Amino acid sequence: MKTAAVAFYGAALVLLLAALKELLTGFEENRCSMTYMFEQPEYRRVVLPRRVSRLFPAYGLYLYGEGVYAQETRNLKLSGTPVLFLPGNAGSYKQARSLGSVALRKAENMEAGLHLNVFTVDFNEELVAFYGGSLLRQTHFLHECIKAVLRLYKNLKVPPRNVALVGHSMGGVVARALFTLPRFNPRLVSLIVTQASPHVAPVLALDPYLLEFYVAVRQKWSTQAQKLRNVTVLSVGGGYRDYQVRSGLTSLPCPPGDPNKLALVATAVPRTWLSTDHLSIVWCKELVLATVRALFDLVDPETRQLTDDPERKRAVLNHHFVRHPARTPQDAADPSVSMPDVPEAWSEVNTLRLSYRTPKEGQLKYFLFALSSRRRAYSHFYCRSSSLESSSWVLGCVRTAGSSCASAVDLSSGTELLPPYKVLVLSLSDLSSFTHLVVSASNLSGKQFTVECEWQREAAQTLSVSVPHLLSFGFSVGEVTVNSSGLLHQVQLLHFHQVYQAFRISVVSSCRGNADRLPSVYRLRVPWFREDSFTTASVPSASEISGMLHTSRPGNFSNVLLQLHTAPNCQYKVSIRTSFPKVLGQVLRFCGPMVPVYTAVTLLLACRGQLCSILRSGRAADMMQVVSAGLQPHQVLLPVYLLHVLLSCSCLQDISSVLGLPPEDTLPPTFPDGVEGAESHEEWPHLLSPLLYVLGAAVAFWGSALLRLLIRLVSLFLAPLHRPSVSRTSGTLSLQTQFLLGVCLYAAAWMFCGALAIFTSCLLHLYRVLRLQMTERSLGHMLNLAPNKRKVTANGAPEAEPQSGTSPRGGAPLLSEGALQEVRDDLQLHLSLMPLLILPVMLSAPSLIHWSRNLRFSTRLDPDPWWLHSVMLASVYLLLINATVSKLSISRLLPVISRLPLPLAVTMATFSSLHLYRLAYFLEAVLVPLAFCFIF
């Protein structure tokens, strides 16, 4: 193998490892606080009807409890508001303990005994993210659970009519799938909260049932959106720490403008402001508190049920998850405020900026800002306070009395909570009915805080900077300097609108003097999706922000903004550089499913190279040589792009639909679902195809090298268990044995699981490869020990070496280099085929795991997406066990079969980027004809 090939694939491996490192570790540390249980958690099993238990023996329903509450609810006599937790992929029903424990602690402080009854569903920790055959079964069981939960309250005077669902991961998708059931009453569920749930598309589509399930859910929520308008759905993504489900997939597929469907990222949630991984989003205290507070605020105290008022549900969820005004929703009921008539408490501010720190002693203090003299020169009024207590702190004065305000209207509802303080920005054009603004700085409790306010011109506070080009590799930099004469500045990041862009944004602050200042807050604001991120920094300091997007910008939205809540009299220097490792991480995050597709493409072309070598010379080439030659972008990517252009034509789309051909496969969209102006197809993944092909080829190359090494090592351990053999037929099967094994494998596929038959037949072929490796080693050792002397004829020439399998004077056959070469050829052929044979095993592994974990409930996998595949693949594996280069080289089918891999590779790259399970069809299209070569 050439050194250049090793160097190239070594560099490709470095790129892949850099992308993986950035994807798995290139984010902030886990800043979530742990939720603790103060008493022993208990899970009380709810007895379900016998019919339900018989239909779903692997599933269960439990009530969460602790301490005294667990004892009080032992008989399941309940009076609270029902909340049902749904675990996700491989999730445990015990994950509800964080939600249940915090809800119990919250109920201790509630009046009138309001509390939540948290139920949790046991889905047997099934791998539903990769095996979709159980999703519909889980949906039906959830329907039965809801009916069983509501039956527990039938003795109450006013029993609850619906439940709230909290779903983690695939549990959130199952919650929305409830509405696809023909007998489901939509009134049974009025609120769904999902955590890190991939609503847009599955992370990996490894079987058709998974995609069929998603299509049914999307179609239901799209076609009957008006009927489901009163169902409130909140979807929370984890952010960049969640590398399993990217946050763009958590957006909700719904019509634009539906106010009852809300999707956001945890970094944008008030009082959370952090990223969570896929598991910690369930127990992250900051997020659990927001969820529990919202659930309690949604309970009607009179009926003890979740409110049916869509306006109230929307207001509560916006309050806790979108824009927290540092006050409770009940405080905003009456905006009219009577002001105290205490002249010494009032001060009129005539300067452009106010900076005030309250004394340690409690006092009443109000500042009065006249509006009449500021309307023409300024556009906004900005104010912030480090007091996070709930209060009416900014008011519009309606009637003045001397130097004080007699009557005012509360304007604090527009307050936004930031990590270190609360902020309010008022547009002067909206304040025409007021004469003055009043800012309250009263600290009757004696707790010190700081208030800073100023008049602002929005145009003067907004700057623009173009981000560097993607291929600048960090050498070019976009810079802007903010000489802070104000408290708020905005920097528009021009041309930053695609998910494959990634930047390191550095903000360096320097100040004059050593005065105490409030910390600065840097907010990366994305207008088209709630994925804002916040960075808090002391002054002076140097901070670095990761500039990346979870979603691409639709066409009708403004630019990304970097908001700087700054300290006065300080200078801020903003530098933006492209981060190549982060770009690689983004490429893998959004286009990762294409890597295994191009790995399969490389292995197919490697098989083509091996077949062409046998056809041309009758000898098998080295496995690593043909795999290294499998990277042929000019023969694959150009036809793929031409197919993409052709299939984009409407006339060809009509023809393909008439012929029943599938549409071109595309990755899930990166635009937020349900946003106007989003394009249906994106072109940038085609531009990244060469990079993805290189990464896929690197996986194929180094994976094949690892497989070759493992086969050598395993054969060393197995050699003492086998008698040394010098025959190339070692490990082969007789026709009768092949027939018996085939019958057993078909029976296993029918009675148990198709993936089991595929896995077993692959092991049989692996054993053949191991025996060939042992034979090759034995022959090599024997030939090295044999004497090298040759007899000399009468004319002085050396006597010709006997052919393999012949012997002088009719004796036993002598070993020769020819015999060793034949074994080596067969070994290289099988080594080249082995990665292709392993791919279906890897694709079917989730089905096999699901079947093995459910053996105590059912011995047969139903439905089985791999049953038909197992019949063909098991037959192919058994036939290929006896494959030899000599048989293949004389086959009349070889010239035709050697031409199949290239068009199949092009078709595979076109139609398998989303439907990964289609890889099996293309592999069978090559392997089945190849197996026929050893029959005819």
Model-derived features: positions:
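Classical eukaryotic N-terminal signal peptides for Sec-dependent ER targeting/secretion
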Residues: 1-13, 630-631, 732, 896
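Short, surface-exposed "cap/lid" segments of acyl-processing enzymes
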Residues: 24-27, 32, 62-128
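Short coil/turn segments at secondary-structure boundaries
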Residues: 22-33, 95-102, 131-137, 177-181, ...
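Eukaryote-biased recognition of electropositive, low-complexity segments
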Residues: 188, 204, 213-224, 228-348, ...
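Preference for solvent-exposed, low-hydrophobicity sequence contexts
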Residues: 328-590, 598
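Serine-dependent carboxylesterase/thioesterase catalytic core
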Residues: 84-90, 104, 108-110, 116-244, ...
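Alpha-helical transmembrane segments of integral membrane proteins
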Residues: 573-936
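Membrane-interface motif at the C-terminal end of an N-terminal transmembrane signal
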Residues: 14-40, 219-227
